[in-house]
């Protein structure tokens, strides 16, 4: 089984190296058990208004990464969520495999911050998803990305100044652990849990 790792819960196990029973026995900080990817997809079908962003973590070998990519793509298709999912990964090989094996129009964004927007576009990616510090060093990448039809997400932006920088520079998405502050700055009407 493939697992979704909730890093916010700081489990003390490496998912790839831990057996199913051990992982399943863990209680997360919020009192829930760690869901399988299958359970995550079942829950996601209940709220298709929410876009699913699936991050595929690095694995030990390219063969294993290819197997993980193919399995995830198959499961997403089986659950009829193909149009409700976008994929992100730090490893270029994983992004390449998603483009290679995924359906036409698959949405893939590269996370590592080492490739230019033009290069990402040439690889068939649909976005860049870089750390705030990378983008602050390369702010021209926002306009370049948009001119190429790529989306721009910046992670993980929690402080008010960083959120303001993202908004002022017209990024498409902000990954944050502080959605209330992002909401406040955007003037949105979305109610986030406290």
PLM-predicted stretches and their roles:
Residues 2-107, 146-148:
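Metal-dependent phosphodiesterase/phospholipase catalytic core, i.e.
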């Amino acid at each position: 089984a493939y697992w979704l790792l909730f890093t916010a819960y700081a489990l003390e196990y490496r998912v790839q190296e831990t057996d199913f029973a051990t992982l399943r026995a863990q209680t997360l900080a919020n009192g829930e058990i760690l869901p399988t990817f299958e359970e995550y997809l079942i829950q996601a079908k209940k709220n298709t208004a929410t876009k699913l962003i699936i991050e595929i973590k690095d694995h030990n070998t390219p063969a294993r990464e290819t197997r993980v990519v193919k399995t995830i793509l198959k499961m997403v298709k089986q659950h009829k969520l193909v149009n409700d999912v976008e994929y992100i990964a730090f490893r270029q090989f994983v992004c390449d495999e998603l483009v290679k094996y995924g359906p036409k129009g698959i949405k893939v964004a590269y996370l590592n911050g080492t490739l230019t927007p033009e290069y990402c576009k040439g690889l068939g990616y649909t976005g860049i998803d870089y750390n705030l510090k990378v983008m602050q060093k390369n702010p021209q990448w926002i306009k370049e990305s948009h001119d190429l039809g790529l989306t721009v997400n910046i992670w993980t932006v929690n402080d008010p100044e960083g959120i303001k920088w993202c908004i002022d520079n017209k990024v498409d998405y902000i990954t944050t652990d502080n959605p209330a502050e992002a909401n406040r700055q955007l003037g949105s009407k979305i109610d986030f849990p406290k």
